[in-house]
């Protein structure tokens, strides 16, 4: 009707769907590599393992991945592991060495060095300081439960 007022209704909650995990990646090899990382980040992953799962050369996959995502595969592995460690530190009382293990870090020292480098604080201080979980970019909910 002419002159009618607009009524805006705020959303009451957000529903996460499978499509929430979707990233627009044009190259199938890079997309496969990304999903391989998301599924296996808790295990020791070598770039050669990822390339082998895609059946192209390591060098070619590294180039495609960097072009598509703007970061290297190793940076993605570290990003996903760090995000998971942040969630564990924020939501559980697990010991730091267990957090490191469950997030895919080889040792608690590796976890500590990664936190210092990326977040400018250690895991213990992160937990005790009540820091918000940092925005480390897109991280699908499916990665949180991967490799369990």
Feature-to-residue mapping (PLM):
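Short hydrophobic/aromatic patches on the structural cores and recognition surfaces of FHA
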Residues: 61, 85, 111
